[in-house]
């Protein structure tokens, strides 16, 4: 559960991410594909090379979903219901991949926002991304 302080940290950090969300997520996806090659199996039709337009487009989709989630911190299940259905029933993504992408996104955010990325902010963002992952995998059961 996100505390009020966590919510403040997440909103403040995401507001600083701003228009860079899609770029940061695309970078995190590239990092994930490189660091965890098994994640590539869900994207057989993508060019996964550095700077790929397909990875950037997917980064934009994920960035928009995270921005929507930040706007609905008190009701993530409703805000992410359609995405949860998609990932559980159509795409059938292994739930561990959400954790891997979350980790790569934290690394990416810390590299772009080193001053703002305090231990407290790190913990808040980690909790937020964990909650998003939990919601996205909730319909797997």
UniProtKB/Swiss-Prot annotation:
Tissue: Red blood cells.
Residues modified to Phosphoserine: 3, 35, 102, 124, 138
Subunit structure: Heterotetramer of two alpha chains and two beta chains.
Modified residue annotations for N6-succinyllysine: 7, 11, 16, 40
Organism: Loxodonta africana
Every Globin domain range: 1-141
GO terms under cellular component: blood microparticle; haptoglobin-hemoglobin complex; hemoglobin complex
Keywords (A to Z) from UniProt: Acetylation, Heme, Iron, Metal-binding, Oxygen transport, Phosphoprotein, Transport
Protein name, entry field: Hemoglobin subunit alpha
Phosphothreonine: modified positions: 8, 108, 134, 137
GO BP terms in the entry: hydrogen peroxide catabolic process
Positions with a binding annotation for O2: 58
Binding site for heme b: 87
N6-acetyllysine modifications at: 16
CDD domains linked: Hb-alpha-like
